[in-house]
A protein has these predicted regions:
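C-terminal non-catalytic regions of proteins with extracellular/luminal or membrane-system context
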Residues: 1-171
Length: 171
């Protein structure tokens, strides 16, 4: 199964659209969705068929859109993460031209009214979510259990010798 992000390629943004962004703060929205039995695909593609770096990374089209926003705004770019699943956004965090990143989750019909309050400065989102996301999927603690491991006491088991309690470990 292939999952695509519905971002348009940069060439579809007309001069009129780009001109309308001049002297404004650009707001870029990156979205992902998932649901039961519809998690991340291992085959993430842009609409033109280009693969993502990883299933959680930002697509090439999204990177182009962010670059256009930086080039055609007043230099202030805010990225909204409209997603209920983790995304790898370290490159956004490290980009000095990104002024703010706000995770909105999936706020439903009225939740973006609260997002508008944050963007206008009426509310300060100083709280923290209880979830912690790894900056890279391979740095997540669960990944330490993946891989091929060699056991030093494997020869005992192969020879038919009975394992001692010390060999069995405290499982």
């Amino acid at each position: 199964d292939t999952y695509t992000v519905g971002e348009a390629p940069a060439e579809l943004y007309t001069d009129d659209i780009l001109e309308s962004a001049k002297d404004t703060t650009a707001i870029v929205v990156l979205s992902r969705d998932s649901s039961e039995a519809s998690d991340y695909s291992t085959n993430m593609k842009d609409p033109n068929g280009d693969s993502f770096d990883t299933p959680m990374s930002i697509s090439a089209y999204e990177k182009e859109m962010i670059q256009l926003a930086k080039e055609n705004s007043n230099g202030k770019v805010i990225v909204l993460i409209n997603s209920d699943v983790p995304m790898e956004i370290q490159e956004l965090k490290d980009d000095p031209e990104i002024g703010a990143i706000l995770w909105t989750g999936l706020p439903g019909m009225n939740g973006f009214l609260g997002v508008c309050d944050v963007l206008s400065g009426d509310v300060n989102p100083s709280g923290h979510i209880s979830d912690t996301y790894a900056t890279s999927s391979v740095s997540a603690p669960a990944m330490t259990n993946f891989g091929l491991y060699t056991y030093t006491n494997a020869s005992n088991a192969e020879s038919g010798a009975e394992l001692t309690e010390a060999d069995k470990g405290d499982w």
